[in-house]
């Protein structure tokens, strides 16, 4: 049997993180700033933006260069704790 601590990923790897939040002019910039605390290589080329059909929400996919499970956990904690963020997948 495999260990609980074994990862399904081989690090380093590119890892997409999906973030949803209320539409705001600075949403994408703010989220990139949060993610850059953990991956300073994130820039506009690694971010996809999609508005919701009603325009009330914005979805982002930010692809980070993940170096460890701990790094991913830290990113998820920072994003889920941010007041502009509704959902992180």
UniProtKB/Swiss-Prot annotation:
Superkingdom of origin organism: Bacteria
InterPro entries the UniProt entry points to: UPF0250_YbeD-like, YbeD-like_sf
One Pfam family it belongs to: DUF493
Alphabetized HAMAP family for the sequence: UPF0250 (MF_00659)
Family: Belongs to the UPF0250 family.
Descriptive protein name: UPF0250 protein Bphyt_0500
Organism the protein comes from: Paraburkholderia phytofirmans (strain DSM 17436 / LMG 22146 / PsJN)
Organismal lineage: Bacteria, Pseudomonadati, Pseudomonadota, Betaproteobacteria, Burkholderiales
